[in-house]
């Protein structure tokens, strides 16, 4: 387990992430005194986008091979269609998401990233929002889709798009600071930040086989 794991947040992404949906939550978390690791399938850096145009690259702190869910108190999944489409097919990313959810840790997921929740088998019975074109996928996976700037269902926080980031970051910080305080007090794992949610391990899931399956994001 990593040193000072009680104040460390994971962000999983790859090439094609929507820039603001990664950089703004990371800034909000770091400004609150939390440590953030950018985790990707490969080392080096990942390419961001502003809508359809390439923007900045972000250095990778750890690869999925190196990252352990036990080292983190929360998980952020930024959007970007290319990013989310690649990560939903990555077995290591899916296992990481399931482990975080099974430990009742906050999952903050925005825009196209709920695809990753669907592919992890974690949408059934949950209420969430997303980029509007994902609503049929969420409903077909057994989830309830609503059109709101931010939706909180137990440990799950979801938003639709970059315009929703102020509300998304507000709810993320509220739940991560709760998790941080609980972990620092020795109540580890801290449990469901919002209460009342069954553990992912208590719900039927279609788990992918363990492994390191990777798929590159398609070119635009």
Where are these regions (language model features)?
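Extended, subdomain-level signal for the structured scaffold at the beginning of enzyme domains
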Residues: 1-103, 107, 115-127, 135-220
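Catalytic nucleophile serine of serine hydrolases
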Residues: 111
